[in-house]
From Swiss-Prot:
Broad class of the protein's primary localization: cytoplasm
Alphabetical keyword list: Aminoacyl-tRNA synthetase, ATP-binding, Cytoplasm, Ligase, Metal-binding, Nucleotide-binding, Protein biosynthesis, Zinc
Record has Protein biosynthesis as a keyword: yes
Binding-site positions, Zn(2+): C108, C110, C135, D137
Function: Catalyzes the attachment of glutamate to tRNA(Glu) in a two-step reaction: glutamate is first activated by ATP to form Glu-AMP and then transferred to the acceptor end of tRNA(Glu).
InterPro entries: aa-tRNA-synth_I_cd-bd (IPR045462), aa-tRNA-synth_I_codon-bd_sub2 (IPR020751), aa-tRNA-synth_I_CS (IPR001412), aa_tRNA-synth_I_cd-bd_sf (IPR008925), Glu-tRNA-ligase_bac/mito (IPR004527), Glu/Gln-tRNA-synth (IPR000924), Glu/Gln-tRNA-synth_Ib_cat-dom (IPR020058), GluQ/Sye (IPR049940)
Protein name: Glutamate--tRNA ligase
Residue sites binding ATP per the record: K255
Quaternary organization: Monomer.
Reactions catalysed according to its record: tRNA(Glu) + L-glutamate + ATP = L-glutamyl-tRNA(Glu) + AMP + diphosphate
Enzyme Commission designation: 6.1.1.17
Gene3D superfamilies, per database record: 1.10.10.350, HUPs
Cofactor: Zn(2+)
Native source organism of the sequence: Natranaerobius thermophilus (strain ATCC BAA-1301 / DSM 18059 / JW/NM-WN-LF)
């Protein structure tokens, strides 16, 4: 083993990447950076029928989007490659042969039908289904006969009897497993590829992995892996199993709770810094009461000893609050760049118009960004700047029925026409105040009618900035439209 801590994230490219997997990647990445270790990415594509290169690329993009850079792995290389299990078949066979030669593994020729009959018989006897060891002591003649029948073989690990396997888990503490409850399991499958448990052990050893942090759904694999480590004479890494992520109803997080794939959050316009902050707090608690952390702060604070044994609850309201905070704090030009697709797909603006009026759009987004939880909500907020007519409804109409409103709005139009420039919000504010002075109103009786007249809403962005961005012509047209409606 190396003196430097080495952690890995080893996803399978068999589908979209789940929030739980990304949380696992994040914890491994944070801990490796916290202890000045190395973070390795390994693709576990031993399931040749389900592994798809497109999903591999999705994994790479998700990690890169979140800023989880890897020191070794696909696209980057390293001294311990290759980093795809499908490219390491010969390595697995080398170690499987060592176990065969040592009498710690054997060839099994049982068909799926025979295995199912075995399981049914065990269930009928009230036993836990597991492999019976039927092929464990086949002679070379018996093996040859089965092979002549055209049977395909697998290689099974010979599980030691009456053995307690103790795992000192970094999160769960001491966990004991009894070998008698574990049947002889497969090391090399009939397609000649290593099983998950075997490939995982060989790779973790050869890649000098010192810490294995993964979801608690892998806890049941751990005794099998520990037995393989011991059978091969390998040093065992430290294991830590992370609690499940639950939905608000305390059931395991699934599609019925909403989005569960990281790509869906990116598509909706969540910022990577918000996702990292939020996911870091799913099962880990920093010291103190703060909940908002930069990536550097998370690296400095992350301690495996503060990872909870209890399941974490995915609270989308908290995520939305966190994302809205990061949107407010973000550079507005960056937000606009990230929002181009939403704006163009909403038919609010063309690519050409967006490029031509870029500075105007930056100002408009800056004005409304505090109203949104995610960037996909931006187009409806920007609609306030479009159109010359105002659609008045109940409460707004009632407020405009006050006697002073027609005179006030007429004076506002006069003041707008008298302005030398419409680009200075301060000048617009003075013009509105001047109109109020002429009519003899101030405060709510002044600003609310003007706001409703230019936006159709009783609440919204800073009034003077809103009017400035509307421009003189559109602002005056809207006030005239409002006057026409209340005077008709």
């Amino acid at each position: 083993m190396t003196n430097k801590a080495r952690l890995r994230f080893a996803p399978s490219p068999t589908g979209q990447i789940h929030i739980g997997n990304i949380r696992t990647a994040l914890f491994n990445w944070l801990y490796s950076r916290h202890i000045d270790g190395e973070f390795i990415l390994r693709v576990e594509d031993t399931d040749m029928n389900r592994s798809v290169e497109e999903y591999e690329q999705i994994i790479f993009r998700a990690l890169s989007w979140l800023g989880l850079d890897w020191d070794e792995g696909p696209q980057k290389g390293g001294d311990f490659g290759p980093y795809r299990q499908s490219e390491r078949k010969d390595i697995y066979h080398k170690y499987a042969n060592k176990l065969l030669e040592a009498g710690k593994a054997y060839y099994c020729y049982c068909t799926e039908e025979e295995l199912e009959e075995m399981r049914e018989a065990q269930r009928a006897r009230g036993e836990m289904p597991r492999y019976s060891g039927k092929c464990a002591d086949l002679s070379s003649e018996e093996r040859a006969e089965l092979e002549n029948e055209g049977r395909k073989s697998v290689i099974r690990f010979k599980v030691p009897e009456n053995q307690t396997i103790r795992v000192n888990d970094l999160v769960k503490g001491e966990v004991d497993f009894e070998s008698d409850g574990i049947g002889d399991f497969i090391l090399i499958k009939s397609d000649d590829m290593a099983s998950y448990n075997f490939a995982c052990v060989v790779d973790d050893y050869l890649m000098n992995i010192t810490h294995v942090l993964r979801g608690e759904d892998h806890l049941s694999n751990t005794p099998k892996q520990v037995m393989i480590y011991e059978a091969l004479g390998f040093e065992t890494p430290e294991f830590g199993h992370l609690s499940l992520i639950l939905g608000p109803d305390k059931a395991k997080l699934s599609k019925r709770h909403g989005d569960t794939f990281i790509g869906e959050y990116r598509e909706k316009g969540y910022l990577p810094e918000a996702m990292v902050n939020f996911l870091a707090l799913l099962g880990w608690s920093p010291p103190g009461e703060d909940e908002l952390f930069t990536q550097d702060e998370l690296i400095r604070l992350f301690d495996i000893g503060r990872v909870s044994k209890s399941a974490a609850v995915f609270d989308v309201d908290k995520l939305n609050w966190m994302n809205s905070h990061y949107i407010k704090e973000a550079d507005t030009e960056r937000l606009l760049n990230l929002s181009k697709e939403y704006l163009i797909n909403s038919d609010l603006v063309s690519q050409e118009q967006l490029e031509h009026d870029w500075e105007w759009f930056v100002s408009a987004v800056d004005l409304v960004k505090e109203k949104i939880d995610m960037l996909s909500e931006l187009p409806p907020q920007l609609k306030i700047f479009y159109g010359d007519d105002v659609d008045l409804k109940g409460e707004e109409v009632e407020f405009l029925e006050k006697d002073h409103v027609p005179e006030l709005l007429s004076e506002v139009i006069n003041q707008f026409n008298d302005l030398d420039s419409f680009e200075d919000p301060k000048a617009i504010k003075k013009a509105v105040n001047k109109a109020g002075k002429q009519v003899g109103v101030k405060g709510k009786q002044l600003f609310m009618p003007v706001r409703i007249a230019v936006s159709g809403q009783m609440h919204g962005p800073e009034l003077d900035q809103l009017i400035s961005l509307l421009g003189r012509e559109r602002a005056i047209n809207r006030v005239n439209s409002t006057l026409s409606q209340i005077q008709s």
